[in-house]
Amino acid sequence: MHHPLPPDDTLYDQVRPILWTGYFLKLLDQRKLPFVVEYVECHSSEDVTQAIRTLIVRGAPAIGIVAGWGAVLAAREIEAVDGIEALRKLEPALQRLHAARPTAVNLAWVLARMRRTLSAAHADWRQVMECEAESIAREDITANRCMGAYGAALIPIGSGVLTHCNTGSLATAGFGTALGVIRAGIAQGRIARVFAGETRPWLQGARLTVWELQQDGIDATLIADSAAAHLMKSGQVQWVIVGADRICANGDTANKIGTYQLAITARHHGVKFMVVASAATVDMDTTAGEAIEIEQRDPEELLGVSGVRTVAEGIAAWNPVFDVTPGALIDAIVTERGVIQSPDAAQMRATFSN
């Protein structure tokens, strides 16, 4: 590395996309990265709803955390004697927040948690709501640091790693999931090389991941998504480390499109494959990946780059957002509850059925 390693990983965790001022919310506008670093102020729950809908904030954990603050801002627009009355008056705003990104699991989870908290609150319900929103953000960072330690312990000293999409501070309250493992591995001197796939069509790897790592002084090398197999064949990568949008009861994992082909390629080349996500991402009610509905986005996203069209008129495109990696191709699933190696239904049940 180009500078001495610190005794811990705090040096490698400088980016914060969500800032609560005590009066309003400031969100790093991820649509404008990496060339413009600009925060957007949200003074109402409607501002927060729009920020979620328009991708100012992205990443399932971050969306959930922001929704919690959206509920706090909504509370300023009503009067109520206790939490029960407040919940009744806040319900329309909470439903609008949920509708902004209805497929985000963390968003629904946070709003359900805020509802439970409110229903038990008394005259101090506003303060209780704000404390709960703070707790949600704080718990996210704590879980991410825990996952970072668990995941890094699996990585031999001197390893190279490849990641996909963006799973760092920009997608969470801080530190990140898969990128948190990489941060911890760098701090411990275990990781010698970091590669990031560009992640078409939104280019989260190219626009966000390598920028985020650069802010923390971590050297990263960008590759085209299509270069992954050649990179693995070269021997420069020992682990592929990715996040997850949903993990099924048998270990099958839905994640950003392109993850499945990385898992297949890794298995062929003897490269280990790690999935890192919070326990809230595990869906024990979905038995296997076949039951996951894969979201399709506008084909127009594939027909250009950064607003510049690169494809002739009249060309069709197919644009699924996620794919499903079978648990059999995953060497380790890492959550804040620990590590499941070679995951299967029995191990998942033992860890998460509570």
Curated annotation (Swiss-Prot):
<protein>
    <recommendedName>
        <fullName>Methylthioribose-1-phosphate isomerase</fullName>
        <ecNumber>5.3.1.23</ecNumber>
    </recommendedName>
</protein>
<feature type="binding site">
    <location>
        <position position="204"/>
    </location>
    <ligand>
        <name>substrate</name>
    </ligand>
</feature>
<dbReference type="InterPro" id="IPR011559">
    <property type="entry name" value="Initiation_fac_2B_a/b/d"/>
</dbReference>
<keyword id="KW-0413">Isomerase</keyword>
<feature type="site" description="Transition state stabilizer">
    <location>
        <position position="165"/>
    </location>
</feature>
<dbReference type="InterPro" id="IPR000649">
    <property type="entry name" value="IF-2B-related"/>
</dbReference>
<feature type="binding site">
    <location>
        <begin position="58"/>
        <end position="60"/>
    </location>
    <ligand>
        <name>substrate</name>
    </ligand>
</feature>
<dbReference type="Pfam" id="PF01008">
    <property type="entry name" value="IF-2B"/>
</dbReference>
<dbReference type="GO" id="GO:0046523">
    <property type="term" value="F:S-methyl-5-thioribose-1-phosphate isomerase activity"/>
</dbReference>
<dbReference type="InterPro" id="IPR027363">
    <property type="entry name" value="M1Pi_N"/>
</dbReference>
<dbReference type="InterPro" id="IPR037171">
    <property type="entry name" value="NagB/RpiA_transferase-like"/>
</dbReference>
<dbReference type="InterPro" id="IPR005251">
    <property type="entry name" value="IF-M1Pi"/>
</dbReference>
<keyword id="KW-0486">Methionine biosynthesis</keyword>
<dbReference type="GO" id="GO:0019509">
    <property type="term" value="P:L-methionine salvage from methylthioadenosine"/>
</dbReference>
<feature type="binding site">
    <location>
        <begin position="255"/>
        <end position="256"/>
    </location>
    <ligand>
        <name>substrate</name>
    </ligand>
</feature>
<comment type="similarity">
    <text>Belongs to the eIF-2B alpha/beta/delta subunits family. MtnA subfamily.</text>
</comment>
<feature type="binding site">
    <location>
        <position position="101"/>
    </location>
    <ligand>
        <name>substrate</name>
    </ligand>
</feature>
<comment type="function">
    <text>Catalyzes the interconversion of methylthioribose-1-phosphate (MTR-1-P) into methylthioribulose-1-phosphate (MTRu-1-P).</text>
</comment>
<comment type="pathway">
    <text>Amino-acid biosynthesis; L-methionine biosynthesis via salvage pathway; L-methionine from S-methyl-5-thio-alpha-D-ribose 1-phosphate: step 1/6.</text>
</comment>
<keyword id="KW-0028">Amino-acid biosynthesis</keyword>
<dbReference type="InterPro" id="IPR042529">
    <property type="entry name" value="IF_2B-like_C"/>
</dbReference>
<feature type="active site" description="Proton donor">
    <location>
        <position position="245"/>
    </location>
</feature>
